[in-house]
């Protein structure tokens, strides 16, 4: 009986995830299965495969704001989208308001994506040196300025990916999430680890819950 009850709840949870429609801005997401952006992996071919398995939303590899501003052809090609993968989000990263706005406008005007996502969660050193990704979590005012200016510059919904904090001494995901909401973002994704954890240890779902309750 207990096994049957457990199976029933598992199927019920899966049903809720698969059929519950989510809306991000003016974009309808048919279910709550969202493919996370992964550098070097989530190109157009990979995204199409994931779409065939029923994902509600797919997200591109992270795209450098500076590379778009400089007109790097290889980076521009990362904006390629197949008609079969909608809805799809293009994720950009950077640490400067002006270049992020310029990059977001380029994506808005030259890509047929449905959503523009801002990466404020990547913990790798190369991104941190560019004052981007989870580096930005140390500077809430800059987070607000980037999101607000990007939102105002584009016609598509803007979402933001964050972590719970830069390290265990500076967990500020609720504060950051409130600022992102105030800046006009349509949705927030939270990785339940700090920047210092990288991809190790356990994700702290309690902080994710706190963000969910706060915004």
Locate each region found by the language model.
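Flavin-dependent oxidoreductase catalytic cores
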Residues: 15-215
């Amino acid at each position: 009986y207990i096994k049957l009850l457990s199976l029933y709840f598992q199927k019920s949870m899966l049903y809720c995830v698969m059929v519950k429609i989510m809306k991000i801005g003016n974009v309808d997401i048919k279910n709550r299965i969202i493919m996370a952006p992964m550098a070097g992996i989530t190109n157009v071919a990979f995204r199409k495969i994931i779409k065939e398995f029923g994902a509600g939303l797919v997200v591109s590899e992270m795209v450098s704001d500076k590379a778009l501003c400089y007109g790097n052809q290889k980076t521009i090609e990362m904006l390629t989208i197949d008609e079969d993968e909608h809805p799809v989000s293009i994720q950009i990263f950077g640490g400067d308001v002006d270049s992020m706005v310029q990059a977001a406008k380029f994506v808005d005007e030259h890509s047929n994506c449905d959503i523009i996502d801002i990466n404020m969660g990547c913990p790798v050193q190369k991104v941190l040196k560019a004052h981007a990704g989870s580096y930005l979590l140390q500077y809430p005012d800059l987070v607000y300025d980037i999101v607000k200016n990007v939102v105002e510059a584009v016609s598509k919904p803007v979402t933001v990916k964050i972590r719970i904090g830069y390290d265990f001494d500076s967990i500020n995901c609720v504060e950051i999430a409130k600022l992102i909401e105030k800046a006009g973002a349509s949705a927030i994704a939270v990785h339940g680890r700090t920047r210092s954890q990288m991809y190790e240890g356990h994700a702290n779902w309690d902080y994710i819950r706190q963000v969910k309750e706060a915004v």
